[in-house]
């Protein structure tokens, strides 16, 4: 069965239209083969659904992320191996006090956050009890092409599943010191995007849901949809996350400020309390115009200049318009892991 046929059959099954799968032609031997193929796809679809779990998290009481993300969070996770490892989007589980996952057959078991990667945004959990489900195989997000059909699987079973298509694959620079060289943008949007599985025509995991976006493509035509983090970014760091909780190598410098691109300027919209920018005196409403002698006009320019200075701990010289003055600020960057709080161990 071709990849396109697989997705067609999966779509029909997951949305409750199993009988609508084309049965060609009508001679009895072919009908029997078609029924056997459909039964096989339905079994595979059930296994695929079983690998998608609901993630519920309660944050530690003094979590810094509670202000923006709330003390209780919920989303989706995907079982990726036989050892109970579950990948999700990290903002659901950062600064967790407790995490539980619920399977498709309504079993609820505890889970532990064992790895987090700020650069990609992935969070990695480990189930506290055997799940007895077949892991979802990881595919190649790099092979996805524009207009290719995909399936979005949030927690909630077949009723929550939806068919989408790839609108674009392109660079994504966010306001919170986050940059992906290639993100996957899909449409139409799902409202259950957080941690949702993006599944290819081959029935493999190719992305994890991150955001609802107004623009899935560049240009004047706005097409709302979702942004997915490519699963390809997890593969080279998975062993590190399992063994050490984070990727190997020097940490990027983090400043603790969010900016908005506005008419060729970077307007400061949020300063993380007690972060490097806050300690240096940067305030909401300031405008970042340069890193040292180099001008910056976009998120990408800012991040590349800052990250290019060295590892976390490096002093970052920012040129900032504050009020009517252009001032030079020196920010002592930190490893972002230092800022977020961990669950106390007694």
Where in this protein do the model-derived segments appear?
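Catalytic-histidine neighborhood of serine endopeptidases
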Residues: 81-122, 127-132
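Short, small/polar residue-rich loop motifs at catalytic or cofactor-binding pockets
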Residues: 72-74, 95, 190-194, 274-275
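N-terminal activation segment of mature serine protease catalytic domains
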Residues: 22-91, 98, 145-150, 239-240, ...
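Flexible, gly/ser-rich surface segments that form the specificity/activation loops bordering the active-site cleft
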Residues: 70, 92, 134-181, 214-219, ...
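A short glycine-leucine-enriched loop at secondary-structure breakpoints
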Residues: 140-141, 196-198, 202, 276-287, ...
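PDZ/PDZ-like groove recognition
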Residues: 189-192, 240-305, 321, 325-332, ...
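Active-site-proximal beta-strands of protease catalytic cores
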Residues: 52-54, 86-89, 146-156, 186, ...
């Amino acid at each position: 069965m071709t990849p396109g046929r697989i997705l067609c059959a999966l779509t029909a099954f997951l949305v409750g239209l199993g009988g609508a799968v084309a049965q060609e032609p009508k001679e009895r031997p072919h009908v029997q083969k078609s029924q056997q193929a459909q039964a096989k796809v339905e079994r595979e679809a059930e296994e695929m659904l079983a690998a998608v779990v609901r993630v519920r998290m309660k944050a530690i009481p003094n979590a810094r992320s509670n202000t923006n993300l709330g003390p209780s969070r919920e989303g989706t996770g995907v079982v990726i191996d036989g050892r109970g490892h579950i990948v999700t989007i990290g903002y659901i589980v950062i600064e967790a006090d407790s995490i539980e996952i619920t399977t498709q057959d309504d079993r609820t078991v505890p889970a532990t956050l064992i790895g987090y990667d700020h650069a990609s945004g992935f969070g990695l959990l480990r189930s506290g009890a055997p799940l007895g489900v077949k892991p979802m195989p990881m595919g190649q997000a790099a092979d996805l092409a524009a207009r290719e059909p995909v399936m979005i699987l949030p927690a909630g079973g077949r009723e929550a599943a939806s068919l989408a298509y790839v609108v674009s694959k392109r660079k994504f620079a966010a306001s919170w010191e986050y940059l992906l060289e290639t993100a996957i943008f899909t449409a139409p949007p799902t409202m259950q995007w957080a941690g949702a599985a993006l599944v290819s025509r081959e029935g493999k995991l190719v992305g994890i849901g991150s955001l609802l976006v107004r623009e899935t493509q560049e240009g004047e035509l706005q097409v709302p949809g979702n942004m997915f983090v490519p699963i390809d970014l997890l593969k080279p760091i998975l062993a590190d996350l399992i063994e050490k909780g984070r990727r190997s190598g020097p940490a990027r410098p983090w400043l603790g400020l969010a900016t908005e691109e506005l008419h060729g300027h970077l307007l400061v919209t949020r300063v993380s309390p007690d972060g490097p920018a806050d300690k240096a005196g940067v305030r909401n409403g300031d405008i970042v115009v340069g890193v040292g002698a180099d001008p910056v006009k976009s998120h990408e320019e800012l991040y590349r200049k800052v990250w290019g200075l060295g590892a976390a701990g490096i002093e970052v010289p920012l040129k900032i318009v504050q009020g009517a003055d252009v001032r030079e600020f020196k920010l002592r960057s930190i490893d972002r892991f230092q800022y977020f709080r961990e669950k106390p161990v007694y």
